């Protein structure tokens, strides 16, 4: 299963409807094909999707919407999904997830969700209604109509027959079983501010050597229900730990984060799934971040169409992109918006980091007035 587009209406934090495309918006030249994933003849998907914006612009919120939509089509109960918090107390949120399945059909799943406060004061979410549309991709005349279902009747609608289904699980579960299809999701949303390595039986030595060449051995062992961590640095005695949190005393947060990330990258490239990373530059140096992006953009390595979806503050990372349509600019001006860069910047030959930092794109640089107020405040506190 490949996600083509996600739209969301009625979200409390957003200024207008959210609309994110994962397929190319601009014309695809021969030289572009090396960094894209070919879905079918004339349709290509982005392998690395960037969401950039200043602090508090809403980048994490956009990532949460994507995570929620992916988990809905994966049949996860909404109330078990961490990203459900983006729904807030909304009474009517409509999420449409457009995807391409194993039968070579383009599908649109529309899920309407409502929040209700429980006795404990927490919000509990349920699906009010659901519809599924589908069409063979062979019937699509051009990219313009790829996700257009205007005038078409749904092939399925949620009804009382779904009584056996929990009211927070999508009825797309039946479609997925019939098509023998699913979507693999790996998320680093919860690891943005946590540096604890989860138990893993296999940490590739190549990953460890790339992140920290001084490490000779790092592996987990489980004996009698207890976990032991074996850590050895070159020319040093082996250290044995029994708590993953203790690794922080020996390894940098960048190395721990890197091991978590690159272990997931291996899985995503193998399965053709999705890796969501919030603040990709957090704890990483720029070289490691660009390496990660290049792995996904290498169509020879990324044969199965694994997709990296990330947020960043780093404008320099935009220069890794030859195209504009794999980048979204996130702003928060009385509500969050996410706009595809190809709609704002028509030419690919303008250096993207310069356009971003110069303020040419509007709302991408901290306001000068706020900067001056901060400077005056600091000056007053020093005097």
Predicted regions and their residues:
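C-terminal lobe/lid and adjacent interdomain/linker elements of RecA-like ASCE P-loop ATPase modules
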Residues: 1-2, 291-383
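Pre-Walker A-like glycine/lysine-rich segment at the N-terminus of P-loop NTPase domains
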Residues: 2-67
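Short acidic, glycine-rich loop/turn motifs
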Residues: 8, 97-103, 131-134, 233-238, ...
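Extended helical coiled-coil dimerization/tether regions that scaffold
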Residues: 9, 184-250, 369-383
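Catalytic P-loop NTPase motifs of RecA-like helicase/translocase cores
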Residues: 14, 283-285, 317-318
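Conserved P-loop NTP-binding catalytic core
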Residues: 44-50, 54, 64-116
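Conserved ABC ATPase signature
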Residues: 48-55, 228-266, 274-287
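Electropositive, glycine-dotted interaction segments
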Residues: 112-224
